[in-house]
A protein has these predicted regions:
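Periplasmic/extracellular loop-to-transmembrane helix junction in inner-membrane transport proteins
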Residues: 1-13
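Transmembrane-helix boundary motif in ABC transporter permease subunits
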Residues: 10-40
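Transmembrane alpha-helices
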Residues: 68-72, 104-138, 165, 169-170, ...
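Alpha-helical membrane-protein architecture signal
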Residues: 2, 32-36, 64, 68-71, ...
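C-terminal transmembrane helix and the adjacent membrane-cytosol boundary/short C-terminal tail
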Residues: 30, 87, 122, 164-198
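Generic hydrophobic transmembrane alpha-helix motif, especially the helices
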Residues: 41-77, 84-85
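Short cytoplasmic-facing helical segments at TM-TM junctions of multi-pass membrane proteins
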Residues: 81-123, 151
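Glycine-rich helix-loop "coupling/hinge" segments at transmembrane-helix boundaries
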Residues: 56-57, 133-170, 189-198
Length: 198
């Protein structure tokens, strides 16, 4: 289980940070968006698990390939939702801040990012679900360790009590991660409490 958590945590961390930066960049700059949009259209419809054989061939280790795919499955929804959040901000907010002498750095850090955070968390929830699926497939096919590998091993040896125990651990792990993300969201967005419907 610790191996699965480490693999998932590293991939989600990389995917979330890169997705947040990418979404913020294309939402703020039309020039950057011009070059990144084709990449989103190309990679968006492709399930990350479909790229597993290619990544296992390219990357020197199955661990690196799995981390990349987990990061990719998180990167796309976080990017799109962050971009949507930045683009959906009322332009009047920027105008008021500029009237008060706000710099571009202030507009990004104190206006754009806080206003886009609810969308960012929606992307995080979507990315976490997708990344968990990629984790299990990667452990079954490439990594050969962790919960996914144990589940496949138990099924192959007809050890059905072990298999159902692995499924229960998977369900509890996913539920715990989602609950933790809800707690983090409620803590960071306490100033919007009462205005969120999810």
């Amino acid at each position: 289980r610790s191996h699965s958590l480490g693999l998932l945590g590293l991939g989600v961390l990389l995917g979330t940070s890169s997705g947040f930066i990418t979404g913020l960049a294309i939402g703020w700059s039309q020039r950057i968006g011009y070059w990144v949009h084709p990449v989103l259209r190309l990679l968006g419809p492709v399930p990350s698990t479909a790229l597993l054989p290619l990544c296992l061939f390219i990357f020197p280790s199955s661990f690196g390939a799995s981390v990349f795919l987990i990061a990719l499955s998180t990167w796309f929804p976080v990017t799109v939702l962050t971009w949507s959040g930045v683009m959906g901000i009322d332009k009047a907010w920027y105008d008021v801040a500029r009237t008060l002498g706000a710099s571009q750095r202030f507009l990004i850090l104190r206006v754009a990012i806080p206003a886009a955070l609810p969308n960012v968390f929606v992307g995080l929830f979507m990315g976490l679900g997708a990344s968990f699926s990629v984790l299990i497939v990667a452990e079954m096919v490439g990594v050969k360790s962790g919960i996914g590998f144990y589940l496949q091993w138990a099924q192959g040896w007809a050890a059905y009590p072990n298999m159902y125990a692995a499924l229960l651990v998977m369900a509890l792990l996913c539920s715990g991660l989602i609950s933790g993300l809800f707690m983090l969201r409620d803590r960071l967005l306490s100033w919007q409490r009462g205005g969120m419907q999810w």
